[in-house]
């Protein structure tokens, strides 16, 4: 679970929960197959689809501060009837 950093709870990600889509921030080196296996084994759910993306880096900030870490997020779509209760998500 070291590569699975935290769940993302933004307005958009909360609206995706109605479609059984959960958003997590992940380690940037994790692959889709590793992430799928990790979610399925840890939460005992079936993942049917995944989308991954990197958050954009603001060039103005990058120029002043230097190189920033890119953050990788994945959206997992679960099988009908499956859900991840937020009480079981412990990212400490």
Curated annotation (Swiss-Prot):
It is found in: Plastid, Chloroplast. Keywords: Chloroplast, Plastid, Ribonucleoprotein, Ribosomal protein, RNA-binding, rRNA-binding. InterPro entries: Nucleotide-bd_a/b_plait_sf, Ribosomal_uL23-like, Ribosomal_uL23/eL15/eS24_sf. Pfam families: Ribosomal_L23. One of its GO terms (molecular function) is structural constituent of ribosome. Binds to 23S rRNA. Belongs to the universal ribosomal protein uL23 family. This is Large ribosomal subunit protein uL23c.
């Amino acid at each position: 679970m070291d590569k699975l950093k935290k769940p993302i709870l933004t307005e958009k990600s909360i609206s995706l929960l109605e479609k059984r889509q959960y958003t997590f921030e992940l380690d940037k080196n994790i692959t889709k197959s590793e992430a799928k296996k990790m979610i399925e084994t840890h939460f005992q759910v079936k993942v049917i689809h995944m989308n991954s993306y990197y958050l954009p880096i603001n060039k103005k900030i990058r120029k002043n501060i230097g190189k920033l870490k890119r953050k990788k997020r994945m959206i997992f779509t679960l099988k009908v009837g499956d859900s991840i209760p937020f009480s079981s998500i412990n990212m400490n």
